[in-house]
Amino acid sequence: MKKLAELLKTTPILRTEGATDIEILDVTADSRQVKEGSLFLCLEGAHVDGHKFVDSAVKLGAKAIVASKEVKATEGVTVVYVADTRKAMEDMVPFFFDYPSRKMRMIALTGTNGKTTTTHVVSHILEQAGYKTGVIGTIHALIGDKELPTHNTTPDVIDLERLLWQMAEEKVTHVCMEVSSHSLVMGRVEGVEFDNAVFTNLTEDHLDYHKTMDNYAKAKAILFEKVSSVGQTKGNKAAWVNVDDPYAHVMMDAVDQKVADLHTYSMSDKTADLYAFDSRFTGKSSAFKVTYEGKTYQFETRLAGRFNIYNTLGAIGAALSEGISMETIAAAMKTFHSVPGRFELIDEGQSFTVVVDYAHTPDGLEKILTTAQEITKGRILVVFGCGGDRDKMKRPIMGRIAARYADVAIVTSDNPRTEDPETIVKEVAAGVEEVKAEKPSLQVEVVVDRRSAIQKAISLAKGDDIVLIAGKGHEDYQILKDKTIHFDDREEARKALKQSARF
């Protein structure tokens, strides 16, 4: 609860019509969520203009309106005019919720792939060290073990600040948060003061939005500018960068080392602050050694694959900057199980391996396929597709990658949205066929219906084979042109295994 006059001091105002000595009980930019005593922010989006919903907001009890265009005045409702309502929101909302990010250690993780796993690993390490953590990310938000739904990798400003306020109220000490490039460019994290940031990697994705990889990298680098900006200090500030990534220098250049400590991690550069080597893999685990400050430590984790060693290194770095000892971190890694939909094993007693993974980018797909090569004696069967209304350039690229590594490539639908599923599948399959011309042993199947594609893969698999079902991971829905239906790759794989009963 804040006085409107207090809120107005946080942002530039053009003029005010009505009383400012009024209590504001809530803040929202969604007219459907207005309740008695709310402040309603009229945001202009790509498809919706909040100024058109002022009447609805007033009817539901809004006591104040923030607008950048003239709106109809209503008796008893204050109208505040600003040049930019989005900027006003970024200024006012963190203040309304008492700047919750200042009350907790804020750990941010960014990169194309690996954010979710790294975030959950950091949280697990901190919990094992005795802290109470909050998690905000692609799958969900967590306060301890309590799960809260989220709609974006990084929630919008109001939802995010409300969530952080709730975490602070519940005495969370550390927040582990995935930060997307979209959220950085769009200012969703503008009011958040970060203490610790990790860069996992940067590979082709979201180019429908960023247009070029350089723009994409600059968007990610905003986080490292933020973590090294002078704010309400809560102790040390740190940045951890995967120097094996070609865009590492962009992140490193963004760090002001007078404010934040810059650290590196690597699996190829022995001079990095954290260097992993002597790695060994099985289908269900990884073991490796890490050097840090002249000492060598042994690590064992149930996370399979080389890419998960990178994820673990990022998490180790973040935990070290929170004052956790290497011994505590190594012990915690032994008890970390997995993240839903991230190289998740589906076991119904079958003789072959089935894995569901969120890999939906060229790099992500290549990483799970190379991991499959490392741990599999038999064939690799991959079920994959590309999302509709998204970057079309990656479709043939992903087809080529799947064909290069797999023995059986099954192209199918993956959230076609408003596009024709068959058109998307053809564009992906074109990349597969390019490789097949040079790799005649490759078996190619085009099965537009995703359920049937999963069933096909299971029916073809034999002992020692691995079936990779890529693209959706934890998602339990399929987005079609006119509706969203329940669909979970893990459920479908289990059903197909039970129906085949070839154990």
Spans of features found by a protein language model:
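N-terminal leader/targeting and accessory segments in enzymes
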Residues: 1-95, 277-280, 300, 304, ...
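ATP-dependent carboxylate-amine ligase
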Residues: 1-15, 36-39, 317-327, 331-341, ...
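Phosphate-binding loop of NTP-binding sites
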Residues: 8, 87-241, 249-259, 313, ...
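Short gly/ser/thr-rich secondary-structure transition/capping motifs
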Residues: 18-27, 89-92, 155-158, 177-183, ...
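Short glycine-rich anion-binding loops that position phosphate/pyrophosphate groups of nucleotides
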Residues: 45-46, 71, 181-182, 204-205, ...
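Glycine/threonine-rich flexible loop motifs
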Residues: 48-52, 186, 208-215, 391-394, ...
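Short internal beta-strands
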Residues: 63-69, 238-243, 383-384, 407-414
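Acidic, Mg2+-coordinating active-site environments of NTP-dependent enzymes
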Residues: 71-76, 196-354, 432-438, 442-445
